[in-house]
Amino acid sequence: PLLETRKIKIEELSGQRIAIDGYNVLYQFLTSIRQADGSLLTDSEGRVTSHLSGIFFRFSKLVENGLQLCIVFDGKPPLLKKNLLEERRQRKLKAQIEWEAAIEAGDTETARTKAQQTTRLESHMITESKHLLDLLGIPWVDAPSEGEAQVASLLNQGMVDYGASQDFDTVLFGASKFVRNLTLSGRRKLPKQQKWVEVSPEIIDLEASFQKLKLNREQLIDVAILMGT
């Protein structure tokens, strides 16, 4: 891997203050917590509950293991992302059509894959998530703009001990101690393969990565731009 990582057990983070990229983890819950045909979990009135299920069960487990969580929600997206957000919207619409076609054809595997590509985070889901976090006693904050940037800012101000996200942008924003796979379950299916891999939390050490790569953060950002991610 490009960056220096170290696999850990959740228990190793006991007592640590961790800022979690809220939008990232909610998308993760909405993508992965689904039924066999790709449909989202719903209550008796048809309201989506996948995001709430993820928050309740997975965050509760982290708290039980002694982690002190703070969830960071995105604010207004930067204007530079306008075209990208429109491209994503169009891809989701295309995936929606392909999902419905796969269901009609009885192809449950393709249906589930396409369904995951339609994932949308609606404003009411954010409101519901914040309410559940309040009930669980887990603090949350709204970022001025990008959640990953706010996570890195909290970390660099010493207000938390680690940042957590699946998005490497958090590292590019300067998160020096970064955790991935914090809220993922133990196994994950590889895309388009009948193969499962074990997933465990891992820490990315930014300073060790810089030493290994002989780069600084500005140069790493340049590499990310050249790679298109």
Could you describe each region identified by the protein language model?
Residues 42, 83-229:
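Extended two-metal-dependent nuclease catalytic cores across DNA- and RNA-processing enzymes
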